[in-house]
Amino acid sequence: GAGLPLKLPEYVDEKTAIAPIVSSGKAARLILNKWKRQYDRTADFIVIEGYKAGGHLGFKKNELLENTCASLKDILKDVKEVVKGFEELFNHAIPVFVAGGIYTNDDIKEMLEAGADGVQMGTRFIGTYECDASMEYKNYFINGKKEDIKIVQSPVGMPGRAFMTPFMEKTHPIKKCFRCIASCNMKSIPYCITQALINAVNGDCEN
């Protein structure tokens, strides 16, 4: 979800389903136009991540802090309108799923009634036995409070929603660059996102 997958069709064969994550109708239109023009392909489905999602967010930091982002329902309406034309062009349905802040059965029903074809849920299941993350990592979600969640600037250049762990409260020197993100400058970023994710899943939430 960190950025626009404009070249995604280049990396998969025609039998592999491709599905972009978007945060607006504008982003959906840009991606689908690019795929149609350059690859003569379209999305098999689309996932909308609203401003309440965890991780990287496709909104401006000030919009997130001031709570002025478009609602998930409004974005859904815009994306469904964009998708119509491409469904007609390619003669197949493009289901639209929504994510971000969906937590209960009532939340799911509300979005289905608003026109979504389904929902995506991630954070809800981190504390389950089936999730293979460490117990230390899970405990941040199980015991965390609303005040512990902050909007931070990620090394990929986008704002994100994260728990303010001891790790997030200090700058970590980068010892090795994995070159996982072309736009990442190890001299200016506060920490290495790849190493941080590996450490967190393994239970080292301090580093």
List the predicted regions and their residue ranges:
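Active-site entrance/lid segments in N-terminal catalytic domains of soluble metabolic enzymes
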Residues: 1-89
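Short catalytic-loop micro-motif centered on adjacent basic/acidic residues
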Residues: 19-20, 96-98
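Conserved active-site-proximal phosphate/metal-binding subdomains
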Residues: 53-97, 103-207
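Charged, low-complexity surface patches
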Residues: 1, 100-101
